[in-house]
Every structure is written in C-alpha cells, then in structure tokens.
C-alpha cells in the first residue's frame, strides 16, 4: 500500500481500525478484540477519520478510547476489509476499514468507553475465528510482526 495520507483521500464510508497485538513470552502472538456496542460481536477497535490526524494516528486514538490501549500504530496499513454497518445505521450499507498494526505497550486505567465493551486477548487463530468479516480473518491470519 502507498504511504500514509490525511483523510481527504478516504471515502465517506471508510473507517480506520487498529490490529492491537502483543507477543507472549512463548513467542506466540495475541490479538486484542473488543465487542461492538450494538451487536456484541468481536471486532478490532475502529472509528471514523479525525480531522488533522493521519490514518494510523486516528486508529491509535480509537484503540485508546475504546479499549484503553496504549501504543503507537504503524504508519502503513496491513490492508483493508469490507463489512456491513451495524443495524442502528444501515445494515445493507457496505463500509471498509483500513487496519493498522499497533503493538500494545500498556493499558490506561481510565478511558472514554470503559465498561461499554468487553476487551479480550485471543490467540491469532482464535481472533481470526471470532471476527465475522472474511477480509479481516485473512489479515489476522497473515499478520506477522516480523514483516513490519
């Protein structure tokens, strides 16, 4: 994918997401997922573009607000995945999210959406099984921090 850019190049139905990850002492990768507030399904932290922020910066802000994640997202996305919006919006409307890897360094005790979502670590395989979107499953399965 090409270099980072401001959100002017994104479509109105494009969001940014963070693939929050950590490496266990065993060398195994774990992926952090949160539940959607509307449906309770497992998703990565994601949200809308933020004026004046680069896409990876906005993804990191969303991860902090939704899961209390502290860390810096990589400037290059891993790719993008398509999904259908939650029923409270327009269930038939397709959107896409560019997803940026973010190595988790810690967690804040207080954050905007604390208590509104479940936040849980999964093995890479389990995370790919828990998400619904085929493109996101592929991105999670293929993720290798050595490629960053």
What is the predicted function of each stretch?
Residues 1-24:
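Acidic, metal-coordinating catalytic segment for phosphate/diphosphate chemistry
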Residues 43, 94, 121:
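Short aromatic/basic micro-patch
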Residues 97-141:
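NUDIX/MutT-family hydrolases
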Residues 26-70:
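Conserved Nudix-box catalytic region and its N-terminal flanking loop in Nudix hydrolases
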Residues 24-30, 89-92:
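Short, solvent-exposed loop/turn segments that connect beta-strands within catalytic domains
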Residues 68-108:
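Active-site segment of metal-dependent pyrophosphate-handling enzymes
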């Amino acid at each position: 994918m090409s270099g980072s850019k401001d959100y002017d190049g994104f479509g109105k139905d494009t969001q940014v997401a963070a693939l929050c990850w950590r490496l266990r002492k065993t060398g195994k990768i774990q992926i952090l997922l949160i539940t959607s507030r509307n449906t309770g399904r497992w998703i990565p932290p994601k949200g809308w573009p933020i004026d004046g922020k680069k896409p990876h910066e906005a993804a990191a802000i969303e991860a902090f607000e939704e899961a209390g994640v502290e860390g810096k997202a990589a400037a290059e996305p891993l790719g993008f995945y398509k999904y259908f919006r939650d029923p409270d919006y327009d269930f038939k409307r397709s959107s896409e999210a560019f997803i940026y890897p973010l190595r988790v360094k810690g967690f804040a005790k207080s954050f905007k959406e604390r208590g509104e979502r479940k936040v849980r670590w999964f093995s890479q395989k389990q995370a790919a099984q828990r998400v619904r979107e085929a493109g996101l499953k592929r991105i999670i399965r293929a993720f290798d921090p050595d490629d960053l």
